[in-house]
Design a protein with these regions (language model features):
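Helical (often loop-to-helix) elements that flank the catalytic cores of nucleotide-handling enzymes
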Residues: 302-323
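Histidine-centered divalent-metal-coordination microenvironment in nucleic-acid enzymes
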Residues: 245-252, 290-308
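Short, solvent-exposed polar/charged micro-motifs at secondary-structure junctions
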Residues: 175-177, 245-248, 289-293, 349, ...
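Active-site beta-loop-alpha junctions enriched in small/polar residues
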Residues: 170, 285-287
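Solvent-exposed loop and beta-edge segments used for protein-protein assembly and interaction
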Residues: 157-159, 293, 395-397
Length: 542
């Protein structure tokens, strides 16, 4: 009986929430309740008819003012009921598929969402359009606000400015049962959708790890806004596990590989003309220096201002033939050239000229190799576009292009990449340096939480007892072994200031310093005499 009461209360509270958020109407209560029962494989309990027939209007307050509503917890109650009813797998992904199915049923259909969005865009209010759409995606649980709030964030002062650090705890850990099922699955058919960025994900029910094609998340509550970039249809959505404010994604309607070229730059410029309050950028289109998904052409953007955008200006340059474009070398660990112009066409042409020149540029004195004997190309760029005013604030009439020069050459000494995080930093970061990290925001793995916690305990023990064998303790601890050399160095430099209250903050600061070194590893022109001379040779060629 208690379970039945919990289901009724959870369903009715969720419906009240959906009405409050204008996802459904007051007269939808009975339909919505029965739809939730269907989703969880139930035929009861009966709803409260006094509640169902309420006629008073709920005040449409700001989305964050509905007191104490726990969307994640409410969906968990309903998902548990679905598991008990045999309507969902007893796994984390099984529960999530039910939760997304419920929220998808309570959301407006894509055509309604598009009409509402375009109505706001039609009166030249792109900020109002994205505010409304972002609010809907949060309210519907597609943007996982509760999960994102669990991320650990801080900033670290460095020679490059304040770098932003995030330990990403928002993405769910893989359930061991899902992992086992994936190992036993047979993938015999065509994979649909081809990847998680395809626009065909809109409304997709998801599938388990044991299913043909393997695990795929449920996307019933995903809504994708059709937009036009360079005359093609693209999709616009928000990221479910956002790394920064209003983290959005634009993805090609065609499942095709990433490419950084004139067409891609045109798409980026079209995007900021649609949404001048957002920046937009593309991962590089080569392995090692690209993102985790190279198979689907897409961009990432949002409302955040990254550390790179506040980097100190070092010197100015011009690009021959483009007198309306000003170029700036930024003091940034990666090699970034910034272009500015009121003239969109000139900025596009100048940026394309730099990209084409860089793709063919070889300077063996600094290890840059454009092509190897096997014909493989190694040079590309990570481009970022935004519009600013004369003070650098987002949304103005000046176009800005940031071009981070990248090279994915490998050597025997650096088999994962010469301009990739070096081995001595892999205990903190060994993954590719993609678009977000290029701009100065580290996305670090959740393993660091227990590992840094264990390192903290050993450092405090060594501080308390001069006879404590710190080196042996670190090497003998599975959580700390990879950090041993780094932790010993931190202790040698900072033991005097170390306390129980500040130990984790000190470790966080030192992690930020390592991230700065990692970005420096990724820079093709180092900040030494040889690197400065090499960069100037490239700029002079323009």
């Amino acid at each position: 009986m208690a379970v039945m009461t919990d289901v009724r209360e959870a369903a009715q509270n969720l419906i009240e929430y959906a009405i409050h958020r204008s996802m459904i109407g007051h007269d939808d209560r009975i339909w919505a309740y029965n739809t939730i029962l269907e989703c969880i494989g139930a035929t009861g309990p009966a709803l409260d008819m006094a509640w169902a027939l309420k006629t008073e209007k709920i005040s449409l307050l700001h989305p964050d003012t509905l007191p104490d509503f726990d969307l994640e917890g409410t969906l968990a109650v309903l998902s548990e009921a679905a598991v008990a009813n045999g309507a969902a797998e007893d796994t984390a992904s099984g529960r999530d598929r039910i939760a997304m199915r419920i929220m998808g049923a309570l959301m407006p259909r894509p055509s309604v969402v598009n009409e509402e969005f375009n109505g706001r865009m039609g009166v030249n209010e792109p900020r109002a359009a994205t505010d409304w759409f972002y609010g809907l995606c949060c309210d519907a649980g597609y943007v996982r606000r509760a999960a994102i709030a669990r991320n650990i964030k801080w900033s670290t002062p460095t020679n490059w400015g304040d770098l932003e650090i995030t330990i990403n705890l928002s993405k769910p850990e893989k359930d061991p049962r899902d992992i086992a099922a994936a190992g036993a699955a047979k993938n015999t058919g065509e994979k649909y959708p081809a990847c998680q960025l395809c626009i065909e994900n809109e409304g997709y029910p998801g599938r388990s790890a044991a299913a043909d094609g393997g695990a795929h998340p449920a996307r019933q509550n995903l809504r994708v806004i059709p937009i036009k970039l360079d005359g093609e249809r693209w999709g616009f959505q928000y990221s479910p596990y956002a790394y920064f404010n209003e983290h959005c994604i634009a993805m090609s309607s065609e499942h095709r590989p990433m490419h950084v070229d004139r067409k891609g730059l045109t798409c980026l410029l079209d995007f900021v003309d649609l949404f001048p309050h957002y920046f937009i950028g593309s991962n590089a289109d080569l392995p090692i220096v690209g993102g985790s998904i190279l198979s689907h052409d897409h961009f990432q953007g949002g409302a955040h201002e990254f550390p790179m955008m506040h980097a100190t200006e070092v010197s100015q340059f011009s690009v021959t033939g483009f007198d309306q474009v000003s170029g700036t070398v930024l003091q940034w660990p990666l090699s970034v050239l910034r272009l500015r112009s009121h003239d969109r066409a000139q900025l596009l042409d100048a940026a394309e000229k730099i990209i084409l020149a860089w793709r063919e540029w070889t300077d063996e004195s600094v290890g840059v190799i454009a092509h190897t004997a096997d014909g493989a190309a190694h040079n590309t760029v990570t481009p970022v576009i935004r519009r600013v005013d004369s003070r650098g604030n987002a949304g103005g009439e000046i176009y800005e292009a940031y071009l981070a020069l990248r090279c994915n050459i490998t050597t025997d000494e650096h088999p994962l990449g010469v301009f990739h995080p070096h081995a001595e930093h892999h205990h903190i970061k060994k993954e590719n340096i993609g678009l977000i990290e290029v701009m100065g925001l580290a996305i670090l793995p959740p393993r660091l939480v227990p590992e840094l916690g264990a390192v903290r305990e050993h450092l405090l023990a060594a501080k308390a007892d001069a006879s404590y064998d710190l080196a042996s303790a670190l090497e003998g601890d599975d959580l700390c072994r990879s950090h041993a050399a780094w932790a010993k160095d931190v202790f040698a430099r900072r033991a005097d200031e170390l306390t129980a209250d500040n130990a984790i903050d000190i470790l966080h600061e030192e992690v930020g310093v390592v991230f700065g070194h990692v970005l420096d590893n990724a820079g093709v022109f180092k900040w030494d005499e040889a690197g400065r001379a090499a960069q100037q040779r490239f700029i002079d060629s323009l």
